[in-house]
Amino acid sequence: EVKDTSYVPIASKPYKTANGKKIDLNKVANSENFPPLSQWSLSKSFPKQASVSKALKNIKSPIWLNDLRNYHNRGNSTFQGESIQLGDFFGLDDVMTESPIVTAGFIKVFSDWITNTGIDGFRIDTARHVNEGFWREFLPAMRKVAKEQGKSYFPMWGEVYDAEPMSTAYWVRQAEYTEVLDFAFQSRVVSFINQRKAELLGELFNDDDLYISDKTNADNLGTFLGNHDMGRIGAFISPISVGPDDLKKDQLAHAILLSLRGVPSVYYGDEFGLTGGEDKEARQDLFPTKVSKWQTQHRIGSDPIGTASSFDIKNPLMDTIKSLNELRVKTPALTRGAQRTFFAKDGVLAIGRYDLETNSRYLMAFNSNSGTKNISFNLDLADAQWQNKSGSATISQKQNLVTIDIPAYSWGIFEMKTDLVKNKSSSAAAKIVLDEPKLNIDRRDQFILSAQVTNVDFAAVDFQIKDGENWRSVGVDKGATFSTDATSNNRYRVFPFLTDVNWNLSPTYRVVATLYDNSTITSQSVSLDKLKP
């Protein structure tokens, strides 16, 4: 307990040993140089004098949580600067995750959950409020334990509450998270549904390239429409009352969620059309409730629940979500396929998905307008045949031009029925065109490699660097960019870090592209010397 909970910056009061020696937390964090607990004094080492009553002195388990020297003791976070990781979270005492004792303790706690319960993954709260060094030890340890339990893939979605892909990509590539929650996806889908901002979704999927490395990509980002903190998709669509088109809008949002890249999650109760608000207002009971405002709260797709159980009520949203989920589960192109944008304008989004292993290809289009929209764009394959698998949109193709008619607040998901490999073999040969490598002006510690693969809509493009004896991959991009600017459209890209390259060995790069028939084409190699720091 501390009376004054205001945050005290390190610059004002640095950590010190019991003998008064300053401790640079950044230098010793999660390392063998971290001062042992015996060198920390509760009265001399911390800016705040924490205390606990005698009755509660040993109440926590594991026992290391009872030692107040295992906490940051700096006061409440201001959610700015260093306090993001060192401050207490709205009064919740912030453990010192830089300490080997704390790191080992949490590894033990979470490992026990895996070994004792057999769980298949974690959703980890407040990930960005913990220092990166902790995650670099903790996350590999969890994967090791899971693998020992026979789990070859053990997802751990970190909650990085930030809607900017550059921020979330940082935690994927530099903090050992291979999965984070995709808050950027959530915000762009809401903007598309409510404000017809298709361009934002097009830009979002271009930014998937930021996640790519030799070990990571955007495939397993956790996608969602709302949650227990921000509120439900129903609340974003119908904050006050239900409009005549709100059911269609809600169904459209779920069609986007369940057909595009990422690992989707449906927030409980959305299938019953719940609305509400933020935080506790988004945590309604589905069983009969005595909370009067929940009894009378408007719902999308059905009437207010009254004293009935949600499980006894029919709602069209449940049927929509169920059918879309069934389609996704049985369709590899939707669960794991590459993705690229073909159209993103005026409240209409058109996306292609492709699975190399099964050579299956899908097109989908979404319309957030109050009237029917007609769009057209070109594909690499002429006169393909398509079959509608979901939604009320219709499609036709003449030569290379695809035309899709999409009713208001609706969608269409179409499967290509043409033999892709057979028909593509008669088309113009694919070629690789490399762009000049350049520094990333948004992050000076990165550079950009980009290339076009002409005459094909989809390719798995492996960017390789040679800064020694052998070529090595720095990432595979499977979805070309979309832009109305020809200089940035149809690009495959990766964003390596400057520190990833041995600049003393005259590094070069090349591209190896895998095509529909699993054949490959390779570019010439290009020097990277001009980027040498």
At which residue positions do the language-model features occur?
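Hydrophobic/tyrosine-rich beta-strand signature of extracellular beta-sandwich/beta-rich modules
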Residues: 511-513
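Solvent-exposed loop/turn segments flanking beta-strands in beta-repeat/beta-sandwich domains
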Residues: 454-469
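Active-site-proximal helices and loops of the catalytic beta/alpha 8
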Residues: 3-44, 48, 108-217, 221, ...
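Active-site clefts of carbohydrate-active enzymes
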Residues: 217-243
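Carbohydrate-interacting/catalytic domains
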Residues: 172, 259-266, 272-448, 454-457, ...
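Short loop/turn motifs at secondary-structure junctions
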Residues: 117-118, 224, 262, 457
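Extracellular interdomain linker/stem segments of modular secreted and single-pass surface proteins
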Residues: 529-533
